[in-house]
Design a protein with these regions (language model features):
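Carboxylate-rich, polar loop motifs that coordinate divalent cations or form catalytic acidic clusters
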Residues: 1-351
């Protein structure tokens, strides 16, 4: 076999007709009109979990189960409004709610609730498990991590941490609201905030280093490292930008993609599809994708589904095998199966 790379002429048609993208709706996974889906995760065993404002749902491909606090099962969750989820290295599922944190022991089925100490740490916006197994928690009270030995939380504050701004000035860490956390290839943490910009925290350090200002609001709402170690930053109201040299904080090289107010200006999350080498993002106005080998070409957008607006795509996941899962507010859970690369076609050998 030899592989011949062809540019397919129908690519432009697919990009131009966003409403025709191939999808499958999971009929058994309907979300009631009174519920809103906020977040989604595919765990290490292939189970899908969806967090809503009325509890947690799981789907194994056949059966949907619901978990929530009510008269029949009081106290399972401290609050039924689930805002974030993560799976740790012991296969425990962690839920961030509007009032506390929950650990689900997958082996025993036991739910356990934890509360962070401050009032501004009640709503858990983001959960992230780093490669060393640490659970990181993002709240309006800043960045915290969970210590499993004594089941306590350590929070970086003005009493124990510092911040170096983009001009090199060092001062006590001020308050900030954490919206996302990710990890680079060296184990450093990148922290995205509501309006305090993008920061880097070296492991074992208590010094947060700020990147140059991203936009007027200094919003960094979502973060993602692609396979080329470019850092993608989704913002709240300012579209998306790519940082091509994130290791160099003095000259990180920002590339801002065009956007318009209320038109793909809020980016909730990114995933990477290795089968097509594309980057996918969910937004308030729909979903979009970008060819990672041609990032200068821009984002192609899907704004409709079945003739109806595809809005409030709150989360997105991938199994790494060409399946993209969307968690939408109005259309439930949708599956997109990406075809083999749109840009490469293997042909049989003629020799």
């Amino acid at each position: 076999m030899r592989t011949i790379y062809l540019i397919l002429t129908f690519v432009c048609c697919i990009i131009a007709k966003a409403e025709t993208f191939p999808y499958r709706s999971i009929a058994s996974f309907n979300i009631s009109p009174a519920s809103e889906s906020h977040c989604m995760i595919l765990d290490s065993e292939g189970m899908m979990w969806v967090g809503t404002n009325s509890g947690l749902k799981s789907y194994d491909g056949y059966t949907v189960k619901s978990y929530k606090s009510n008269a029949l099962s009081p106290g399972i969750l401290p609050n039924n409004d689930i805002r974030s989820m993560a799976e740790d290295h012991e296969q425990n599922l962690w839920l961030g709610t509007r009032n506390g944190l929950v650990k689900i022991n997958r082996k025993t089925g036991v739910f356990k609730t934890y509360f962070l100490p401050s009032e501004d740490q009640r709503i858990i916006y983001h959960l992230f498990v780093s490669r060393d197994g640490t659970l990181w928690v993002g709240t309006d009270g800043g960045l915290s991590y969970f210590n499993p030995e004594n089941e306590s939380f350590y929070t970086y504050t003005s009493r124990n941490a510092w911040r170096i701004d983009e001009n090199g000035k060092k001062q006590r860490l001020n308050s900030f609201s954490v919206k996302c956390v990710t990890e680079d290839k060296n184990g450093d943490l990148l922290i995205g905030t509501w309006s305090s910009g993008l920061m880097r925290l070296k492991r074992g350090s208590n010094v947060f280093r700020s990147y140059p200002k991203l936009n007027d609001m200094n919003s960094a709402y979502s973060l993602f490292f692609d396979r080329n170690h470019r850092l993608w930053v989704g913002t709240w109201g300012y579209g998306v930008l790519c940082i091509s040299n994130p290791d160099n904080q003095k000259n990180p090289q920002y590339h801002q993609y065009p956007y318009a107010t209320n038109n793909f200006d809020i980016f909730y999350k990114f995933v990477e599809d290795p089968t097509t080498n594309t980057l996918w993002a969910c937004t308030r106005e729909g979903i979009c994708y970008l060819d990672e080998d041609q990032p200068q070409a821009g984002w192609s957008k899907y704004t409709q589904i079945g003739g109806n607006p595809l809005i409030y795509c709150n989360d997105i996941s991938t199994d790494g095998a060409g399946n993209i899962w969307l968690c939408t507010q109005n259309d439930g859970v949708l599956q997109i199966t990406t075809p083999p690369s749109l840009f490469r076609m293997p042909l049989p050998s003629t020799t």
